[in-house]
Amino acid sequence: MGGLSIWHWLIVLLIVALVFGTKKLRNIGNDLGSAVKGFKDGMKEGETPADAQQLPRTGTVDVNAKETTRSDSNKA
């Protein structure tokens, strides 16, 4: 008595089919399926390889560069 048997689920399914109709249930199933497919496609678009996410560094770095302050720029 703790859980529902297969017969309980079949009766519930039959009542739901009678209340909503099979056409309405089929439309709901199609909508749900397309929503899940769209979600999966969106998740695949979000995934990119780690190498593609990093931008290539082609610039040079001036090791001897000195930081200019606001007072240094006013002197010029």
UniProtKB/Swiss-Prot annotation:
The keyword Zinc does not apply. It comes from the Bacteria. The chain crosses the membrane at residues 1-21. One of its GO terms (cellular component) is TAT protein transport complex. Residues 40-76 are annotated as: Disordered. GO terms for biological process: protein transport by the Tat complex. Pfam families: TatA_B_E. InterPro entries: TatA/B/E (IPR003369), TatA/E (IPR006312). Signal peptide: none annotated. The keyword Cell inner membrane applies. It is a single-pass membrane protein. Gene3D superfamilies: 1.20.5.3310. Residues 64-76 have a biased composition (Basic and acidic residues). Keywords: Cell inner membrane, Cell membrane, Membrane, Protein transport, Translocation, Transmembrane, Transmembrane helix, Transport. It is found in: Cell inner membrane. One of its GO terms (molecular function) is protein transmembrane transporter activity. The Tat system comprises two distinct complexes: a TatABC complex, containing multiple copies of TatA, TatB and TatC subunits, and a separate TatA complex, containing only TatA subunits. Substrates initially bind to the TatABC complex, which probably triggers association of the separate TatA complex to form the active translocon. Part of the twin-arginine translocation (Tat) system that transports large folded proteins containing a characteristic twin-arginine motif in their signal peptide across membranes. TatA could form the protein-conducting channel of the Tat system. Belongs to the TatA/E family. This is Sec-independent protein translocase protein TatA. It comes from Burkholderia vietnamiensis (strain G4 / LMG 22486).
